[in-house]
Amino acid sequence: MNTLVCISHVPDTTAKINFTSDGHSLDATGVQFVINPYDEFGLTKALHLKESLGGTITVLNVGGPETEPTLRKALAIGADQAVRIDAIPSDAITVAQNIKNHISANSYDLIICGQESIDYNGQQVPAMIAALLQLPFTNACVGLD
């Protein structure tokens, strides 16, 4: 089974967050970034499925070069491949369209996304990906056997 796990690069919840002097954006100076915890849960489930069914796990992130440590962490956890789509994740539909384009050009049996990202809490991207690909979708899964 070939599984795609979409991961976000988010500020650690223990980080002290400051804004730029104009108050319009995050000042990332000194902020530790991590794999979105909900996405890490999805990666863990993908690893369990791989243990029982075989296959490969690809992690995918939409972002700039600053997200490379997040992808490397996912590889260290057990993902087989990492893909970074070099784009600014400015809004949910932009992220979803970039992910949809990658999925359309590749072959995956299962696509796993966390239920939401802890930075925006939008819960939009997974549903948008499913709609763009005309695939079935379920959110906030608590089990998968």
Regions found by a protein language model. Give the residues of each.
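N-terminal glycine-rich FAD/FM-binding segment characteristic of electron-transfer flavoproteins
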Residues: 1-145
